[in-house]
Swiss-Prot record:
Name under which the protein is recorded: Large ribosomal subunit protein uL22c
Record text on subunit structure and interactions: Part of the 50S ribosomal subunit.
Top-level division of the source organism's lineage: Eukaryota
GO terms for MF: rRNA binding; structural constituent of ribosome
Stated role: This protein binds specifically to 23S rRNA. The globular domain of the protein is located near the polypeptide exit tunnel on the outside of the subunit, while an extended beta-hairpin is found that lines the wall of the exit tunnel in the center of the 70S ribosome.
GO CC annotations on file: chloroplast; large ribosomal subunit
Location(s) in or outside the cell: Plastid, Chloroplast
Keywords: Chloroplast, Plastid, Ribonucleoprotein, Ribosomal protein, RNA-binding, rRNA-binding
Lineage: Eukaryota, Viridiplantae, Streptophyta, Embryophyta, Tracheophyta
Source species: Nicotiana tabacum (Common tobacco)
UniProt cross-references to SUPFAM superfamilies, sorted A to Z: Ribosomal protein L22
Length: 155
């Protein structure tokens, strides 16, 4: 029986005090990118969600170097997901003995990094990738405007 070499490491951040939608806005920008490119993107983005995600990226890279002995140049973010966590509920005291509820949302962030030097499938897919660009047509068809009698006839 052949044992497959482990090529993925992950870092999990739970109960991060932030909305899941705000964290997803940043995660969608870094999914599928290399380690160095991700660090540059996160350091330049102006969102508050970048700092906890940056800490998770550092943690996943440290896990990869410690557990697999891989270098940071070979790491690619293969999976990044944000799930909603528990909602912290508090009461804010108001006038006349009343209180208003405050709901503080949390989220769970999972970062999975893959070492591309150990992964054979990634190397094969990278070599099969087409490098040609498709030429887009810049001419816009106006047949709908001409067939309908134009836009100026209607009041």
């Amino acid at each position: 029986m052949l044992k497959k070499k482990k090529t993925e490491v992950y870092a999990l951040g739970e109960h991060i005090s932030m909305s899941a939608d705000k964290a997803r806005r940043v995660i969608n920008q870094i999914r599928g990118r290399s380690y160095e490119e991700t660090l540059m993107i996160l350091e330049l983005m102006p969102y508050r969600a970048c700092y906890p995600i940056l800490k998770l990226i550092y943690s996943a890279a440290a896990n990869a170097s410690y557990n697999m002995g891989s270098s940071e140049a070979n790491l690619v973010i293969s999976k990044a997901e944000v799930n909603g966590g528990t909602t912290v509920k508090k009461l804010k005291p108001r006038a006349r003995g009343r209180s208003f509820p405050i709901k503080r949302s949390t989220c769970h962030i999972t970062i999975v990094m893959k070492d591309i030097s150990l992964d054979d499938e990634y190397v094969e897919m990278y070599s099969l990738k087409k490098t040609r660009w498709k030429k887009k047509s810049t001419a816009m068809p106006y047949r709908d405007m001409y067939n309908s009698g134009g836009l100026w006839d209607k009041k």
